[in-house]
Amino acid sequence: MNIHNEQFGRFFNEFKVGEIYKHSVTKTITESDNNLFCLLTMNHHPVHLDKEYATNKTHGEILVVGSYIFSLVVGMSVKDISGKAIANLNYEKVTHDKPVFIGDTLYAQTEVLDVRESKTKSDRGIVYVETIAV
């Protein structure tokens, strides 16, 4: 019988272009989560904190801070993607296609777009990925 332990991260040679990792970690956003992130980052815009103010704006309810969503999605991918990485070198494009509200649950997945050896460090490689949340 083979017993496999859950893997935390992957080594460079384990990544294959086209592979998709559906991240098992999910997150339901609470009002406390959003409030704490606003406090920590000093983002006190009332659309993120004031229910009465937000009710009279475009979305009609409190809008969760986009940078919090970005942070969560990156965090959701760590176990599968960057757990063994030396560094996250770059984030090329961050978009928020839909608003996120208190009570929404986020799911994320990452697709491997490209894998190449480093041009400057022969013992390393670079993995290009696209991570999306739904």
Language-model features: locations:
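Hot-dog-fold acyl-thioester-processing enzymes
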Residues: 1-91
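Mid-chain, well-packed structural core segment of small domains
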Residues: 84-89, 94-102, 108
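Short histidine-centered beta-strand/loop micro-motifs
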Residues: 61-62, 85-86, 98-99, 119-122
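Glycine-rich loops and low-complexity Gly/Arg-rich segments
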Residues: 46-51, 88-89, 97, 113-114, ...
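HotDog/MaoC-like acyl-thioester-processing domains
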Residues: 1-17, 100-105, 109-134
